[in-house]
């Protein structure tokens, strides 16, 4: 927070007194306040979280504590659908688009002096926000696929990769929605971007080589081992359940099913536990590899970036820091009303884990997962939009899906 420096007034002469009135911090502050009152920053939070309203409320609350005279206008935008419009000052983007956004000139870099408490950010997350050696986004939240299983299921608890999981679960012969009790795998492989991202994640596991995919791989031919592994996941889930999208678009419906007894195991993000409610205490989770070899843990990283076209770069960078701060993220993740649960998203700052684990022990386990030295941010190259568009057409057929209509982005 900014501090206003005062000074001691001594009545030496009238002229000096008048001069002090003109240049006093109070006068300067008033002028700054008047100027700021005419400024509105346009901002977009990351929409694909269990409770976006908590994030918006936290950002607004923390911002008003620092810059009460600068208004915020929240707008709907996401990096999957479009490049940032010129009038969008600050926004949260998925780092799979970071290289594209940087190379296209959409983002301002952050110098070391522009990042508040950089030492608190998970090192791999900050490294994953760089392009050509410069930071172009402040890490806010992370996502990674986890294998969820019930505490008493010791055999699933011994699984480390999808091939071992298949040996325990086998092929599901049910197309039932919701799936049968304690049978099969619950997993969402419906979207076109989901399939494409899973292919590239698995390719890193299969090759054993981490890459930011500056050069994206060819779609002809596809990697046979990766396709076989993805098909195993579909077989464990059943084709229809794996491609199912509810009419209301509920991204966490499978977590609800799992809490109600469906499926023997569930692969999803940590934030799915918010939907499980109290049942989350009966569940264990762990990372799972797409390869029988060494696992390279990959994390999606949502970063707060500043538009290169903003008319207020200093204020915009200040807002970006507020949005990515430990105070804002902790407030957004905590329950804000009776009957609510933590969002169980993965924050990108150590302080948030330390605070949340005091009240929610699950965050102690999540902290262990994000602090592994082998963790990397999942990044895609500057041609990401073209590659994804092409992959959405190729992958459903390659995966042997009979209903290829589910090409949602």
Curated annotation (Swiss-Prot):
Primary site of residence: secreted
Protein's organism: Paenibacillus thiaminolyticus (Bacillus thiaminolyticus)
One record GO biological process: thiamine catabolic process
Complexes and interactors: Monomer.
Name by which UniProt lists this protein: Thiaminase-1
Biological role: Degrades thiamine by replacing its thiazole moiety with a wide range of nucleophiles.
A Pfam family the protein falls into: Thiaminase-1_dom
Signal peptide: 1-29
GO molecular function: thiamine pyridinylase activity
Keywords per UniProt: Secreted, Signal, Thiamine catabolism, Transferase
């Amino acid at each position: 927070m900014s501090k206003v420096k005062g000074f001691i007034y001594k009545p030496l002469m009238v002229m000096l007194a008048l001069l002090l009135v003109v240049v006093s911090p109070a006068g300067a502050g008033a002028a700054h306040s008047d100027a700021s009152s005419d400024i509105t920053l346009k901002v977009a939070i990351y929409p694909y979280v269990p409770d976006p309203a908590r994030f918006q409320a936290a950002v607004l609350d923390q911002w008003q504590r620092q810059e009460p005279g600068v208004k915020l206008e929240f707008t709907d935008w996401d990096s999957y659908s479009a490049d940032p419009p010129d009038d969008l000052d600050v926004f949260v983007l998925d780092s799979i688009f970071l290289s594209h956004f940087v190379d296209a000139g959409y983002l301002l870099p952050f110098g070391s002096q522009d990042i508040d408490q950089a030492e608190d950010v998970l090192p791999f997350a900050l490294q994953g926000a760089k392009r050509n050696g410069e930071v172009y986004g402040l890490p806010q939240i992370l996502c990674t696929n986890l294998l969820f299983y019930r505490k008493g299921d010791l055999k699933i608890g011994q699984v480390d990769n999808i091939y071992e999981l298949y040996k325990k679960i086998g092929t599901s012969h049910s197309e039932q929605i919701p799936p049968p009790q304690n049978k099969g795998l619950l997993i969402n492989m419906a979207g076109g971007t989901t399939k494409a991202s899973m292919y590239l994640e698995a390719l890193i596991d299969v090759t054993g080589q981490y890459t930011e995919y500056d050069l994206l791989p060819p779609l002809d031919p596809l990697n046979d081992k990766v396709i076989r592994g993805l098909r195993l996941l579909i077989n464990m889930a059943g084709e229809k359940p794996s491609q199912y999208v509810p009419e209301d678009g509920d991204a966490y419906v499978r977590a609800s099913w799992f809490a109600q007894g469906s499926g023997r195991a569930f692969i999803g993000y940590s934030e799915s536990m918010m939907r499980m409610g109290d049942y989350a205490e009966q569940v264990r989770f762990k990372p799972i590899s797409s390869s029988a070899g060494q696992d390279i843990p990959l994390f999606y990283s949502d970063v707060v970036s500043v538009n290169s076209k903003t008319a207020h770069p200093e204020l915009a960078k200040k807002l970006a820091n507020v949005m990515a701060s430990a105070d804002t993220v902790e407030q957004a993740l905590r329950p804000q009303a009776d009957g609510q649960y933590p969002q169980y998203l993965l924050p990108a700052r150590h302080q948030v884990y330390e605070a949340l684990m005091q009240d929610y022990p699950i965050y102690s386990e999540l902290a262990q997962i994000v602090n592994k030295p082998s963790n990397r941010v999942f990044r895609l190259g500057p041609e990401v939009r073209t590659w994804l568009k092409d992959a959405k057409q190729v992958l459903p057929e390659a995966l042997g899906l009979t209903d290829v209509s589910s090409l949602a982005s």
